[in-house]
Amino acid sequence: MAPSAARCHGGCVSRSGQCVLVPRPEQRGGFIERGDVIDGRCLVAGHLAGDRAWYSRPDHVVVVVMENHSAADISGNGEAPYINALAARGALFTRSFAVAHPSEPNYLALFSGSTQGVTSDACPLTLTGTNLAAELAQAGGTSAGYSEGLPAVGDPVCSSGTYARKHAPWVNFPSLPATVHQPFTAFPSDFAALPTVSFVIPDLDHDMHDGSVATGDTWLAEQLRPYATWAEGHNSMLVLTFDEDDRSRDNQITTIIVGAHVRAGRYDEHLDHYRLLATLKALAGLGNSEPGALQPITDAWTR
């Protein structure tokens, strides 16, 4: 049956029984949903006209940030069997880099697209301007940062036991609601209830900052293996990255993405915290229209 006008979406119209592209198609970071166009071809009821292939935006993305180890420290390390298992079944970015030393400016870059001029682990900070949580909220999405050891929802304390605020960049933006800042105990057991984008921040004992690689790897396996397994069958993604390496000039780190619609393999394209943020925004459908904006990852997804 010829496609009707109602089934030709986005920048496409029905002409002579075919969906055809009109001059200025909408494109959203390579991720396809109803109303979009890819490779100059039109979507029909959410699929490419004449093509069974499709793309899907994930319902949730969970970003876990570990600490202070280079890619060389982790790759093939017998003390990190779980991380290396994730790398084997997911997308491993072999040229992934942090943007600064010490920790805090890296977290700010990943969350807000800027180090905000911060060159230390200062606390407290009061910052303004755009950030991922604010952009998500404006677009109708949701976000949360789940920090292990945080005493209470929204607590602005700089440190408490093995919790460190310097690893929770959202706290530094007072325009965000306190509910963005959650203890890890609030991480949903019903994974379908996860926010659009969330961050998991292990404490200093479990993020490899103070504890060993083996301790951090074991924590990841115990705490996040159920979610990572669930994600692969439920349109969800887990991103594992590090804030920085061991303070070398190269600052090369491990970044792995696993989950639904992730094309397993090794990717040697350049990736840093800024480009990872651009990818998180694209995954959430936010776009990245600023002049000179970095392009998100587009080749690590299946159709």
What are these regions (language model features)?
Residues D51-R303:
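Flexible, surface-exposed loop/gating regions in the mature catalytic domains
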Residues M1-L48:
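Extracellular/cell-surface secretome signature
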